[in-house]
């Protein structure tokens, strides 16, 4: 249960109890009322700005109104005390019995604690990675892969119907270049000397194997075919090989998509899908024949002052109208974007999320314009931009050679430090802030390494369970037994840990609403810190140890608390896509 939603309802009920009404009649606007943890934990358990938000509407001084609301809240059986602070903040401190009951709810829900129905009935498409199938994934793809994957997991946990999607850019000019590059490697595999790879082709050694496989399958037959026919075969085989490599890289990172959508699908049957999408926009009045003003600055060599088929995107929020067709009659890449969005919308998605690199910032307004035009404003579109990742080793930048074909791959990073450190650390900054990734720091065993610190807390929980087996003979811990004596948890440090656990449902919902999966990583670090602190208190004070051999009921209660910590760590790490270890190796 979200305790803040619970007390939001209780606080609003007091408005009826004190007959709180707007001075000018009508209904109170309660939308700006916030109920949240106080910024300073010493101020209490729950804080609200209700009096300050409502004072003008009811015609009363904020502090006086706060005092009225506070007096009504004192009648709540779960409230220990209520204070008015500053200009009219109301701070509530709750009784230990309330936290003990909440802990029992958490224990009974297990790893489902925090699961929400926030997104019930809402279908969301999260598109991420969508790297061009022209080579292995490099480290630059890594952040978007993790952000998109964890966001999708988070939304699922919050009750949304989520589809993870990868858009395969397999219809552009870069694929033609790729096919010619592989054709060269195919000839090389047949024994021909190809010399230096010509400028403009893909030079990577990863294409050598594709050429060898083609030589093994076709022998010299491709050389005997018309070039266009041979290149079509090479293109198909190469895309399959590149996507197999990309899927393997993603699998190593524990990233798994539900749908792989080929751009070529939009172009079948003479691009019928694109033509239909443009026809729909035309019927809505969003397409016209016209000329675009010349671009600012020096004109490109291929600039043509000509009449074009244009999307009237400035009327739906874009900076300029966008061409839908090229001078040769083929469709622009943007026309494909329009069609792909329409396809998603026709599949029943209420919301589409695009996770893109920061270099795609110029796409945001045009995609938002497409969403408004195609769905008549009914669908929500969000673009999350991921800033660059800078690689370091022991504080020194990792130098990547600019020589063509050499770069650090995603697989290089995962193989060196492991999947979990990569996933966790890619979330340890908000996606729109640059991120430094130090190979040494993410593998050190210290508090300064967030993923180690969180996973170590999980392992410590299980070490407590093993101690319970050794010292109390409790091999199979029973949740009913553990929850039967929570009234014994009265130490302030124990209650503080319960408070931190109680924040989890609110954290899940707020991270889902704001589409900020990094909040989960921060919360898990804070929870781990609280648990480690409680462990250390037990090391310093025998009365606070989790296992008290001479007090089995208290031991069971504390084991129940540890179990809930373990459940929440497991839940959060699962959403992140990392393991919750039972011991550290």
From Swiss-Prot:
Keyword check for Ligase: yes
Top-level lineage group: Bacteria
Reaction(s) catalysed by this chain's protein: tRNA(Arg) + L-arginine + ATP = L-arginyl-tRNA(Arg) + AMP + diphosphate
Chief location category: cytoplasm
CDD domains recorded: ArgRS_core
Group of enzyme by EC: ligase
Biological process annotations from GO: arginyl-tRNA aminoacylation
Motif ('HIGH' region): 131-141
InterPro entries in the record: aa-tRNA-synth_I_CS (IPR001412), Arg-tRNA-ligase (IPR001278), Arg-tRNA-synth_N (IPR005148), Arg-tRNA-synth_N_sf (IPR036695), ArgRS_core (IPR035684), DALR_anticod-bd (IPR008909), Rossmann-like_a/b/a_fold (IPR014729), tRNAsynth_Ia_anticodon-bd (IPR009080)
Cellular compartment(s): Cytoplasm
Gene Ontology, cellular component aspect: cytoplasm
Keywords (A to Z) from UniProt: Aminoacyl-tRNA synthetase, ATP-binding, Cytoplasm, Ligase, Nucleotide-binding, Protein biosynthesis
GO terms, molecular function: arginine-tRNA ligase activity; ATP binding
EC code: 6.1.1.19
Family (UniProt): Belongs to the class-I aminoacyl-tRNA synthetase family.
Subunit annotation: Monomer.
Name of the featured protein: Arginine--tRNA ligase
Species in which this protein is naturally found: Brucella abortus (strain 2308)
């Amino acid at each position: 249960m979200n305790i803040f939603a619970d007390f939001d309802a209780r606080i609003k009920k007091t408005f009826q109890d004190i007959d709180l009404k707007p001075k000018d009649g009508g209904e109170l606007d309660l939308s700006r009322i916030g109920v949240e943890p106080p910024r300073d934990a010493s101020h209490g358990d729950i804080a609200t700005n209700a009096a300050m938000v409502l004072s003008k509407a009811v015609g009363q001084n904020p502090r006086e109104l706060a005092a009225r609301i506070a007096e009504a809240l004192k009648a709540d059986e779960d409230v220990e005390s209520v204070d008015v602070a500053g200009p009219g903040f109301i701070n509530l401190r709750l009784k230990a019995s309330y936290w003990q009951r909440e802990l029992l709810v958490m224990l009974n829900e297990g790893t489902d604690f925090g699961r929400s129905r926030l997104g019930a009935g809402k279908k969301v498409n999260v598109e991420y990675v969508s790297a061009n199938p022209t080579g292995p994934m490099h480290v630059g793809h890594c952040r978007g892969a993790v952000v998109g994957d964890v966001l999708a997991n988070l939304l699922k946990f919050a009750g949304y119907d989520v589809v993870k999607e990868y858009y395969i850019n397999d219809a552009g000019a870069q694929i033609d270049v790729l096919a010619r590059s592989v054709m060269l490697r195919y000839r090389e595999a047949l024994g021909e000397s190809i010399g230096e790879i010509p400028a403009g082709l893909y030079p990577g050694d990863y294409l050598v194997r594709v050429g060898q496989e083609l030589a093994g399958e076709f022998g010299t037959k491709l050389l005997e075919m018309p070039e266009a026919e041979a290149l079509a075969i090479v293109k198909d085989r190469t895309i399959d090989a590149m996507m197999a490599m990309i899927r393997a890289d993603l699998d190593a990172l524990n990233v798994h998509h539900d749908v792989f959508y080929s751009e070529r699908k939009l172009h079948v049957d003479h691009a019928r899908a694109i033509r239909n999408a443009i026809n729909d926009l035309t019927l809505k009045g969003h397409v016209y024949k016209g000329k675009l003003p010349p671009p600012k600055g020096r004109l490109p060599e291929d600039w043509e002052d000509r009449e074009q088929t244009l999307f009237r995107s400035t009327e739906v929020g874009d900076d300029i109208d966008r061409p839908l067709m090229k001078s040769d009659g083929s469709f622009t890449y943007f026309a494909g974007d329009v069609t792909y969005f329409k396809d998603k919308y026709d599949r029943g998605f209420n919301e589409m999320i695009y996770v893109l690199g920061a270099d795609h910032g110029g796409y945001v307004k045009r995609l938002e314009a497409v969403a408004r035009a195609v769905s008549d404003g009914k669908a929500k579109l969000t673009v999350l931009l991921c800033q660059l990742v800078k690689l370091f080793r022991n504080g020194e930048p990792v130098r990547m050679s600019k020589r063509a074909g050499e770069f650090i791959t995603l697989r290089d990073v995962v193989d060196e430090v492991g999947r979990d450190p990569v996933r966790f650390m890619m979330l340890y900054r908000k996606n729109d802030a640059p991120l430094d990734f130090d190979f040494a720091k993410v593998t050190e065993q210290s508090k300064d390494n967030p993923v180690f610190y969180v996973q170590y807390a999980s392992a410590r929980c299980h070490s407590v369970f093993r101690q319970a087996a050794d010292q109390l003979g409790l091999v199979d811990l029973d949740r009913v037994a553990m929850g039967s004596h929570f009234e014994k948890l009265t130490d302030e440090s124990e209650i503080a840990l319960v408070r931190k656990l109680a924040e989890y449902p609110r954290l899940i919902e707020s991270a889902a609403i704001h589409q900020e999966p990094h909040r989960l990583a921060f919360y898990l670090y804070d929870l781990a810190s609280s648990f480690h602190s409680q462990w250390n208190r037990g090391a310093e004070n025998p009365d606070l140890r989790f296992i008290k051999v001479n007090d089995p009921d208290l031991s069971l209660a504390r084991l129940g608390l540890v179990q809930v910590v373990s459940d929440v760590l497991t839940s959060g790490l699962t959403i992140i896509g990392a393991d919750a270890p039972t011991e550290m190796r």
